[in-house]
From Swiss-Prot:
Modified positions (Phosphoserine) in chain numbering: S35, S37
Regulation: Activated by GTP. Inhibited by CDP-diacylglycerol and by phosphatidylglycerol 4,5-bisphosphate (PPI2).
Signal peptide as annotated in the record: none
GO CC term, one of those recorded: membrane
Protein name: Phosphatidate cytidylyltransferase 1
Highest taxon listed in the record's lineage: Eukaryota
Tissue: Brain, retina and testis. Found in cerebellar Purkinje cells, pineal body, inner segment of photoreceptor cells and postmitotic spermatocytes and spermatids.
One family name in Pfam for this protein: CTP_transf_1
Membrane topology: Multi-pass membrane protein
GO terms classed as biological process: CDP-diacylglycerol biosynthetic process; lipid droplet formation; phosphatidylinositol biosynthetic process; positive regulation of fat cell differentiation
Biased composition (Basic and acidic residues): 22-56
KW Transmembrane (keyword) present: yes
Gene: Cds1
Chain residue ranges for the region called Disordered: 1-68
Length: 461
């Protein structure tokens, strides 16, 4: 985000200096008929020009406090800072992984709540950085409108999800039917109300700055809400499409750190001086192997491979189905050189294992660029971490900067190469039609199946 500077030797707000008169402006006020817009532009230039300044002009965000538990500090007090950070990161990583396994055990609904909670926290961390940088300018309604827009965008995206995956539940509730039927109009009306509130909150001194912060909020919404929505869409395709990509990113993060910590010598990128080629390459091979094994293990269980569906008869999410061909063992011919090494011509694999190679490759080669992007953002504001939520790790956004990029790739991958027509969704749409429309579809479908020879023609006597 760009920062304020002052033109023409005019000191900041509250300073004693005055700007030089503009061309054609008399000292005695002979040009009182000059347009108000020109005067407002001059004020905007004095107080809101955010361009053409060096990094030294960026105000430093107050440093985050250390939240490492005291008992952990005392236990590691004799170690160097390098090894102290190693142990803190390691202990907290194992703790988070254990909690993640617990949430997986609790089911897909808890995973959805976890994704929403992470989304809100990431949004709060990014918005807080903007507020800390510009809090001295007392922007009216900035934080209130930011959270209002978050609610509006969430309503827009997740209203669509409710309509798609909870159709049977919605049909039983009159109030929900109204919200779903007019969902897009309600979403637009809510956003329009926030837009009008923003326009009404504009203040002369801060026009340009307020528009910068308006853009800040919307870019933050684009990063957090849309990506978390894609994560939940992936989860509905089957928990395996959620777990393998996320765990691949986590594996790459851990193994790249380990390889870099012990073997790192060659810097990888200037944005992150601690990143090394050794860590990057070691993380790549480790992640591909991990993803391949994880795909094999998870493909065995319906709990992970079946699409998540809401069943109205049991009033809960279920993961029961006949696994698709993607999750059924198939024989594949080995290349000649592997046949010589393994002394066999074929190998049994789940087709999803082959897809996992693409997912793991993206997680290890492209995913880290999400982290590099976040590093550049933090360098721009002279901060080490987005927050201090997790000792040794920083904020929640520091842990999920690569996950958001991964979520988009997985969603595009599924829609491009995997997803076909969903019979349950088609049936849900048919059930909400009028009886006459349903009969017309039935007759058309019957004629179509008869012409294809699937149904025997019925002869009228």
């Amino acid at each position: 985000m760009l920062e304020l500077r002052h033109r023409g030797g005019c000191p900041g707000p509250g300073g004693a200096g005055t700007p030089p008169p503009r061309e054609g402006e008399a000292a005695g006020g002979d040009h009182e008929t000059e347009s108000t817009s020109d005067k407002e532009t001059d004020i905007d230039d004095r107080y809101g020009d955010l361009d053409a300044r060096g990094d030294s002009d960026v105000p430093e965000v107050p440093p985050s406090s250390d939240r490492t538990p005291e008992i952990l500090k005392k236990a590691l007090s004799g170690l160097s800072s390098r090894w102290k950070n190693w142990w803190i990161r390691g202990i907290l990583t194992l703790t988070m992984i254990s909690l993640f396994f617990l949430i997986i055990y609790m089911g897909s609904f808890m995973l959805m709540l976890l994704v929403l909670g992470i989304q809100v926290k990431c949004f709060q961390e990014i918005i807080t950085i903007g507020y800390r940088v510009y809090h001295s300018y007392d922007l009216p309604w900035f934080r209130t409108l930011s959270w209002y827009f978050l609610l509006c965008v969430n309503y827009f995206f997740y209203g669509e999800t409710v309509a798609d995956y909870f159709a049977t539940f919605v049909q039983r509730e009159e109030q929900l039917q109204f919200l779903i039927r007019y969902h897009r109009f309600i979403s637009f009306a809510l956003y329009l109300a926030g837009f009008c509130m923003f326009v009404l909150s504009l203040v002369k001194k801060h026009y340009r700055l307020q528009f910068y912060m308006f853009a800040w909020t919307h870019v933050t919404l684009l990063i957090t809400v849309t990506q978390s929505h894609l994560v939940i869409q992936n989860l509905f395709e089957g928990m395996i499409w959620f777990l393998v990509p996320i765990s691949s990113v986590i594996c790459n993060d851990i193994t790249a750190y380990l390889f870099g910590f012990f073997f790192g010598r060659t810097p990888l990128i200037k944005l992150s001086p601690k990143k090394t080629w050794e860590g990057f390459i070691g993380g790549f091979f480790s992640t591909v192997i991990f993803g391949f094994i994880a795909a094999y293990v998870l493909s065995k269980y319906q709990y992970f491979v079946c699409p998540v569906e809401y069943r109205s008869d049991v009033n809960s999410f279920v993961t029961e189905c006949e696994p698709s061909e993607l999750f059924q063992l198939q024989n594949y011919s080995l290349p000649p050189f592997l046949q010589a090494v393994l002394s066999r011509e074929t190998v049994s694999l789940y087709p999803f294992q082959i897809h996992s190679i693409a997912l793991s490759t993206f997680a290890s080669l492209i995913g880290p660029f999400g982290g590099f992007f976040a590093s550049g953002f933090k360098r721009a504001f002279k901060i080490k971490d987005f927050a201090n939520t997790i000792p040794g790790h920083g904020g929640i956004m520091d842990r999920f900067d690569c996950q958001y990029l991964m979520a988009t790739f997985v969603h595009v991958y599924i829609t491009s190469f995997i997803r076909g027509p969903n019979p349950s969704k088609v049936l849900q749409q048919l059930l909400v039609l009028q009886p006459e429309q349903q009969l017309n579809i039935y007759r058309t479908l019957k004629i179509h199946l008869t012409e294809k020879g699937i149904l025997q023609p019925t002869w009228k006597v």
